[in-house]
Structure formats: structure tokens, C-alpha cells
From Swiss-Prot:
It comes from Acidithiobacillus ferrooxidans (Thiobacillus ferrooxidans). Its EC number is 1.16.3.-. GO terms for biological process: aerobic electron transport chain. This is Iron oxidase. PROSITE patterns: HIPIP, TAT. InterPro entries: Feoxidase_Iro (IPR048112), High_potential_FeS_prot (IPR000170), HIPIP_sf (IPR036369), TAT_signal (IPR006311), TAT_signal_bac_arc (IPR019546). Keywords: 4Fe-4S, Electron transport, Iron, Iron-sulfur, Metal-binding, Oxidoreductase, Periplasm, Signal, Transport. It is an enzyme of class 1 (oxidoreductase). Homomultimer. Predicted to be exported by the Tat system. The position of the signal peptide cleavage has been experimentally proven. It is found in: Periplasm. Catalyzes the oxidation of Fe(2+) to Fe(3+) coupled to cytochrome c552 reduction.
Length: 90
């Protein structure tokens, strides 16, 4: 195979971009993709009612006082913790 045969043509690149954009649009319309805020089951994020060291829900950027979260579904403890923990910025 020659060097010229290995090159991607502009037509091929545009076709590939169109396929990717179409796939993303179709996936979005089907409702597949990023979960809605507050819809992840506790088990999926390994939620626990106790803190992990100094990390706990009340100091997490995802926490919505008094007992909600942008990621985890249902009521949560301000002293809880999960793998979605993101410390609040100072």
C-alpha cells in the first residue's frame, strides 16, 4: 500500500464527521447518555450514610441542602459519601 493510499481524503473525513454527528443526535433523541441529575441509584455510586475521612456530602459541590443531591436519587445524609463526591471550590 502506497503512502497516497493511506491518506484520508477530505470526502472520507466529512463522511466520518457526518456519521458521528448523526449518531450523537440519534442517541440524544433516544434518551440514552448522561443520566439526569439526581437520578443515579445509591448503589450505582456506592453511596454510604457515613463520611469517608473528611469527605462527606455537606462539603460536596453536588449536595443540595438539606437532604438532596444533583447526582444521587432520593434523600441523602449530609454526613454521607459516594464516588461522585466533588469538593466545593473555595
Amino acid at each position: 500500500m502506497s503512502e497516497k493510499d493511506k491518506m484520508i481524503t477530505r470526502r472520507d473525513a466529512l463522511r466520518n464527521i457526518a456519521v458521528v454527528v448523526g449518531s450523537v443526535a440519534t442517541t440524544t433523541m433516544m434518551g440514552v447518555g448522561v443520566a439526569d441529575a439526581g437520578s443515579m441509584p445509591k448503589a450505582a455510586v456506592q453511596y454510604q450514610d457515613t463520611p469517608k475521612g473528611k469527605d462527606h456530602c455537606s462539603v460536596c459541590a453536588q449536595f443540595i441542602a438539606p437532604h438532596s443531591c444533583k447526582v444521587v436519587a432520593g434523600n441523602i445524609s449530609p454526613n454521607g459519601w459516594c464516588v461522585a463526591f466533588v469538593p466545593k471550590s473555595a
